Amino acid sequence: MVVNAVVGADEASARLREYCSGLPDVEKKIAESTSPEGAKLVSDFGIGSVPMVVILDEDSSELFRTADIGELEKFFS
């Protein structure tokens, strides 16, 4: 599983970054929206707003997409 997170400088972004950084046993790509890596993730996944987390399976198929920390916590529980 791959967790891709594009974050900004707001409080919601900080909470998503912290949560995603602490996830065990998953590959993580966490990038600022203004960085080249963040811009690539925005382009690759058609992200329209930041923050956003896109979770992929081993075959790179999208499993889940959210900007809501509560939904993300439910997904991983």
Curated annotation (Swiss-Prot):
The organism's taxonomic lineage, starting at the top: Bacteria, Pseudomonadati, Spirochaetota, Spirochaetia, Spirochaetales
Protein name per Swiss-Prot or TrEMBL: Uncharacterized protein TP_0084
Organism: Treponema pallidum (strain Nichols)
